[in-house]
């Protein structure tokens, strides 16, 4: 029964071509979809970038749909009404879901992420040519909304560049929920103690006086604050403590709106 159910599911959500109207008869649109209610914003960024690259390679105009399936960037009542992607990024090729609502040639993509070789995963750090390709793809199609760009530039100017010549070490730490769950085929960061030791080593080597820390995890934040009192900078205002097995998206969305939380995280990464 399980196998039959999966076959039905895969058939319903297969790649298929539809006609929604007669507009844009000379364009072929590819709607990028993904069903993943536990994946974070940057997981969607990586897989969407891969799907954009593949759609363009096949001669389509990519359009991202993060509206018609639940994801951690939307409140339950926003599903089907708000495209989460458009809150943070510009459309990759200028067209939104709303723009193509009456388009003639539309292909709906499968709801699973691209195969490993079609999206930027950690293997690219071992291949300079692949890294350069994904960097070029991101620069072309991954454009932040102007308001996010302004906040990034403002923080850098007011905080990081306040003292000319001062060196600040940038550090990103994934949450302990990621470390506890140990998702298959994902790289694991060192324990916080090892991160602290490496920070001390790099700060000494390069003469850094402060650390810009990007993390949503309260435990990691507390450990870093204790190790480097008065030296930690961060754009983020809130952090979260997860229990065993709890997803940090759920913990964060319980105290802050998904939009505000993910915008804050996106800006903090942009600053980094």
Residue ranges and their predicted role:
Residues 207-272:
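Donor-binding and catalytic core of enzymes assembling or modifying cell-surface/extracellular glycoconjugates
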Residues 5-200, 205, 221:
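Secretory-pathway glycan-assembly enzymes, especially type II membrane glycosyltransferases
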């Amino acid at each position: 029964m399980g196998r039959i159910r999966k076959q039905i599911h895969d058939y319903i959500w297969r790649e298929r071509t539809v006609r929604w109207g007669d507009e844009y008869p000379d364009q072929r649109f590819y709607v990028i979809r993904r069903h993943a209610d536990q994946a974070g914003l940057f997981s969607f960024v990586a897989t969407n970038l891969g799907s954009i690259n593949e759609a363009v390679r096949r001669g389509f105009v990519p359009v991202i749909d993060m509206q018609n399936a639940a994801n951690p960037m939307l409140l339950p009542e926003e599903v089907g009404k708000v495209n989460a992607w458009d809150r943070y990024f510009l459309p990759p090729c200028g067209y939104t879901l709303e723009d193509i609502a009456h388009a003639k040639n539309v292909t709906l993509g499968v709801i699973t992420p691209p195969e490993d070789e079609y999206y930027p995963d950690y293997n690219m750090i071992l291949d300079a040519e692949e890294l350069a390709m994904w960097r070029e793809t991101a620069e072309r199609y991954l454009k932040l909304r102007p308001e996010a760009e302004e906040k990034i530039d403002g923080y850098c100017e007011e905080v990081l560049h306040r003292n000319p010549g001062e060196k600040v070490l940038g550090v990103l730490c994934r949450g302990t929920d990621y470390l506890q769950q140990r998702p298959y085929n994902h790289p694991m960061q060192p324990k916080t103690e090892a991160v602290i030791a490496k920070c001390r080593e790099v700060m000494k080597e390069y003469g850094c006086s402060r650390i810009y820390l990007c993390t949503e995890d309260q435990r990691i934040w507390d450990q870093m604050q204790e190790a480097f009192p008065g030296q930690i900078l961060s754009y983020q205002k809130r952090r979260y403590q997860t229990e065993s097995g709890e997803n940090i998206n759920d913990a964060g969305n319980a105290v802050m709106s998904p939009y505000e939380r993910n915008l804050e995280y996106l800006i903090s990464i942009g600053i980094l």
